[in-house]
C-alpha cells in the first residue's frame, strides 16, 4: 500500500561554518601530497553538538588513525526527483560513539548525533569532516559531495512510496496542450 513520506535534511552545524568544500585541491593539500578533499569541513569548536543530517539508522561506529572517532548514518535524500538513501560519515569526533549508539539504532533528522572534536592524525584543529556516499566505510569507498546532497532536501519534500524498495516521487500531471 502506498504511503506518504516527508524527507528533510539538516546541516550538521551552521552552514556559515563551512571551511573547506568537497573536491578542493589547494596548495597545502598539494604540498602534503594529498589528492582533492573527499569531504566537507565545518570549522567548529571542540564539543560542538552536531545534528543528524536526516532520519535513518546508525550504520557504522569506530576509529581510524587518520580520521579519528567517527559515526556513519544512513539518511534519505531526494536527488533529481528520485529518493536515494545515502551514507553520511562524521569524522574527527570528540569521543568514541559506541557508548551512545549501536549499529542499527534509529536516528531522527535534526537531533544531536555527536560532538565535534580533534581526533585523528589528519585533523588540523577542531572541526567536523563530513563525507557522503553509497557504502559504509566511506574512508575507503567512493564519495560524493555532501553539501549537494544536504541542500537538495533542506526544504521538506513529500513523496509517495509504493514499498520500501521502490519509492516513487509524485509529480504534477503534465498539462495537455490547448487545442487551436
What are these regions (language model features)?
Residues 63-64, 120, 135-138:
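Acidic glycine-/aspartate-rich tracts in secreted/extracellular proteins
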Residues 45-49, 94-104, 117-120:
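Gly/Ser-rich catalytic serine loop of serine hydrolases
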Residues 41, 72, 89-92, 115, ...:
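Conserved beta-strand positions that form and line the central face of beta-propeller blades
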Residues 70-71, 107-122, 130:
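Short hydrophobic beta/alpha edge segments that flank linear recognition/processing sites
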Residues 2-14, 83-86, 99-111, 127, ...:
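Acidic, glycine-rich catalytic/binding loops that coordinate metals and/or anionic ligands
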Residues 53-100, 126-132:
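Zn2+-dependent peptidoglycan hydrolase active-site motif and core
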Residues 46, 62, 117, 150-154:
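Sec/Tat-exported extracytoplasmic proteins
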Amino acid at each position: 500500500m502506498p504511503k506518504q513520506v516527508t524527507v528533510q535534511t539538516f546541516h550538521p552545524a551552521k552552514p556559515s561554518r563551512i571551511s573547506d568544500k568537497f573536491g578542493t585541491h589547494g596548495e597545502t593539500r598539494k604540498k602534503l601530497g594529498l589528492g582533492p578533499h573527499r569531504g566537507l569541513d565545518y570549522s567548529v569548536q571542540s564539543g560542538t553538538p552536531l545534528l543528524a543530517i536526516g532520519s535513518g539508522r546508525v550504520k557504522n561506529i569506530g576509529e581510524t588513525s587518520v580520521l579519528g572517532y567517527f559515526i556513519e548514518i544512513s539518511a534519505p535524500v531526494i536527488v533529481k526527483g528520485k529518493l536515494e538513501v545515502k551514507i553520511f560519515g562524521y569524522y574527527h569526533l570528540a569521543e568514541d560513539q559506541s557508548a551512545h549508539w549501536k549499529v542499527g539504532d534509529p536516528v531522527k533528522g535534526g537531533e544531536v548525533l555527536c560532538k565535534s572534536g580533534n581526533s585523528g592524525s589528519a585533523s588540523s584543529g577542531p572541526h567536523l569532516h563530513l563525507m557522503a556516499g553509497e557504502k559504509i566505510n566511506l574512508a575507503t569507498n567512493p564519495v560524493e559531495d555532501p553539501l549537494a546532497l544536504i541542500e537538495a532536501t533542506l526544504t521538506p519534500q513529500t513523496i509517495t512510496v509504493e514499498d520500501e524498495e521502490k519509492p516513487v516521487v509524485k509529480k504534477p500531471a503534465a498539462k495537455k496542450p490547448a487545442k487551436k
